[in-house]
């Protein structure tokens, strides 16, 4: 995939990958063997008919390819950019046995971008079936559920807590990985289908789940409110100035443009930044810090590179952009001056012991190996949990001890007519898994309402 030069892109927020040309897309699509048993489809959480859309691309029929994709996915331009295809559809590609797998994700992105560039494309709005469904949260789970239900004729309203629709797609994923204009285009397409989007609506505070159903006539509610409550390490110094959760750091950077001189919510311009964690969010935070002008940015992770949960592509991009990896190290204290600003982070070196419950080798401290990392800002990226607000205001809604909503395989919660999916159920996971949950719940909601009204 053509990309910006690392030493150029680490100073701007423009998209890293520039995408396929028509000629390259057709050439790549022609590598597909069109296998009869279609293993790639089984590797896709939303079950896109991958060989079918690739066949259309190979023949130069990009409109036909989009029609195939859109039957299964409401967010193809998003998926083509941020889904971990290398561990899903592309990992099942027969081509990958002896050579590189077909670039399924890149082809999906190409098709979606081609479609979005057309000015004469009209969305066919289905006839209303007279039933109302509320969606709480406008992230990938909520938008997917909304799109599938709208296509079935439902009157769908999405309630978003922030001032812009998109959820984690706009506040969590940086512009250089997923341009906000792409997300807005996907949201606009849903609006053309008839989906209503209400922003600045915190469900659980402005309105409750019960009020949506009892007072506003929604026959079912889907909760896709994500997992935006950050976790911390509970070590000394986490309350110092210059310590951010990755959630706050990325939201300020991506959504509020806090790095601009005229920002009403400014963010600290640090010279040396430590990002604690090894997932995709940690990579995003580190790469943002570099673009914000930090001279040195460190990823501090307590395991080895082999155990990094981030996508390999994101790790490689971070390395190319000059991010320094301090592996097998764990913070024990954040240090500050008398004005309570960060001056450093004390770490201890680790070694890997026996595997833990996750199957990864457990990191063990090496006694006497403490050292101080010279930094003036720290970003904590060790995971998130669902916000407890909906749980606290919805009687009879069962949740896990850690806060996740309990739902069955179809997304049904302990409350009749109330469904949930995505990070609100699983904890922080991938965009495509959230989309799969939204899709499954949409089918279940449709069945529930249709059976209820027989």
Regions found by a protein language model. Give the residues of each.
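A conserved FAD-binding loop/helix module that cradles the flavin
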Residues: 424-452
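FAD-site-proximal beta/loop scaffold in flavoenzymes
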Residues: 239-270, 355-428
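Ferredoxin-type iron-sulfur electron-transfer modules in oxidoreductases and energy-metabolism complexes
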Residues: 9-28, 48-81, 98-125, 253-254
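Local cysteine-cluster metal-coordination motifs and their immediate loop/turn environment
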Residues: 30-49, 74-97
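Glycine-rich dinucleotide-binding loop and its adjacent helix/turn
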Residues: 111-127, 185-205, 230-292, 399-410, ...
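Rossmann-like dinucleotide-binding cores of NAD(P)H-dependent redox enzymes
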Residues: 155-158, 162-192, 197, 286-333
């Amino acid at each position: 995939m053509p990309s910006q030069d690392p030493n150029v892109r680490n100073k701007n927020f423009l998209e890293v990958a520039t995408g396929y040309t028509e000629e390259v897309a057709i050439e790549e699509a022609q590598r597909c063997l069109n296998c009869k048993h279609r293993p790639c489809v089984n590797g896709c959480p939303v079950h896109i008919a991958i060989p079918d859309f690739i066949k259309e691309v190979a023949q130069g029929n990009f409109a036909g390819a989009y029609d195939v994709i859109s039957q299964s996915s409401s967010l193809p331009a998003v998926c083509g950019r941020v889904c971990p295809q290398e561990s899903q559809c592309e990992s099942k590609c027969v081509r990958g046995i002896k050579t590189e797998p077909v670039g399924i994700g890149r082809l999906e992105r190409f098709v979606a971008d081609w479609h979005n560039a057309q000015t004469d494309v009209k969305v066919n709005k289905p006839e209303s079936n007279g039933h109302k469904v509320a969606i709480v949260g406008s992230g990938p789970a909520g938008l997917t559920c909304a799109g599938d239900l709208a296509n079935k004729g439902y009157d769908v309203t999405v309630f978003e807590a922030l001032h812009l629709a998109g959820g984690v797609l706009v506040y969590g994923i940086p512009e250089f990985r997923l341009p906000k204009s792409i997300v807005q285009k996907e949201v606009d397409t849903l609006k053309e289908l008839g989906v209503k989007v209400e922003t600045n609506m915190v469900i659980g505070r402005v309105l409750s789940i019960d009020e949506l159903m009892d007072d506003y006539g929604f026959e079912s509610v889907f909760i896709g409110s994500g997992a935006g409550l950050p976790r911390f390490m509970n070590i000394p110094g986490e309350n110092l100035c210059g310590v951010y959760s990755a959630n706050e750091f990325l939201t300020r950077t991506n959504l509020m443009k806090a790095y601009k001189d005229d920002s009403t919510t400014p963010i600290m311009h640090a010279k040396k930044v430590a990002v604690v964690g090894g997932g995709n969010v940690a990579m995003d935070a580190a790469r943002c810090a570099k673009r914000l002008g930090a001279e040195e940015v460190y990823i501090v992770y307590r395991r080895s590179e082999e155990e990094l949960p981030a996508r390999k592509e994101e790790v490689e991009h971070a390395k190319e952009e000059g991010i320094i990896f301090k592996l097998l190290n764990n913070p024990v204290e954040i240090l500050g001056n008398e004005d309570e600003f960060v001056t450093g982070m004390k770490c201890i070196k680790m070694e890997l012991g026996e595997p833990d419950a996750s199957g990864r080798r457990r990191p063990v401290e090496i006694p006497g190996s403490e050292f101080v990392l010279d930094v003036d800002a720290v970003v904590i990226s060790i995971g998130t949990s669902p916000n407890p607000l909906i749980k606290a205001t919805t009687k009879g809604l069962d949740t896990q001890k850690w806060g996740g909503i309990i739902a069955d395989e179809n997304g049904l919660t302990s409350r009749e007519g109330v469904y949930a999916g995505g990070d609100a159920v699983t904890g922080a996971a991938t965009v495509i898994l959230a989309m799969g949950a939204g899709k499954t719940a949409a089918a279940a909601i449709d069945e529930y309402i249709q059976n209820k009204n027989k």
